[in-house]
Amino acid sequence: YHYALLSVGGEVRGAFETLLRTLSLAPVVVQATAMGLGENQITTFLLPVRSSSHPLFNPDLDYSVYLSNPFFFVFFQVIILLVTVYAIGSEIKFRTGDEWLEAARMNMFVAVVGKLLPYTIIFCIMSVFANYIMFGVMHIPFACGFWPLNLTAILFVVATQALAVFLFSLFPAIAIVISVVSMVGSLGATLCGVTFPVDSMYAPVHFASYLFPVRHFVEINQNLLYGDYGFPYTWVNVSSLFAFMLLALALLPHLKTAILSHKYENIR
């Protein structure tokens, strides 16, 4: 079976095992029929206990219910990371950093917030609209209200932008940081736990998954969509998303120094 993609491999393996289970019963059925046993007797012998499954919030076991919402935001976080670092990096690339800081009266926090706020509003509108399409138009079932999903999406957008600011502060050269955030976005998609359970990964990889905002977002959303068990089960993830903002704030002085030094403007 194909395990290059775990989700596809799991489906193929499940279908293969179901087929083999049916084929393995064929000789027994033929022999029992030859002995004169009726269909009900054969069924009772082969399946003495019938299982009855009732999946919560997805009785049809529709894969789109499980994957549509997280997959959208997994890919969306890559766009947020790339747009955010380019928006800030363009000031260094086109050597307008001094004018940018002067417009903010040399306040790096004001400069970053003023630069990113329009993008934040656009990303938040896109997130709310995506939730409306998935849960209002496509009628994907969910256990919570509509606004908790939107507030979680908005927090995710801001936390992802904060991660982008943090990474750009570490690598304040747009030619370098574009590659870095692309790698971070890809790793976040891999380690978010959508296609493979994080708990089953190697311990170092498991703990590394919590370095990505999308992992915390997926855990919060799973809580909201499949039970809405309350804030006590997600407060760690919510706190972690706020922690990304603190990381970005901590490196703003370094970013300001990098802009004023002009030494990253010639890196292509």
Where are the predicted features?
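Transport-system extracytoplasmic interface segments
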Residues: 1-83
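Hydrophobic, membrane-facing alpha-helical anchors
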Residues: 23-32, 131-136, 158
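Short amphipathic alpha-helical interaction/hinge segments
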Residues: 27, 31, 80, 96, ...
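Juxtamembrane loop-helix boundary motifs flanking transmembrane segments in multi-pass membrane proteins
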Residues: 43, 56-60, 100-113, 138, ...
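Hydrophobic alpha-helical transmembrane segments of multi-pass membrane transport proteins
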Residues: 54-134
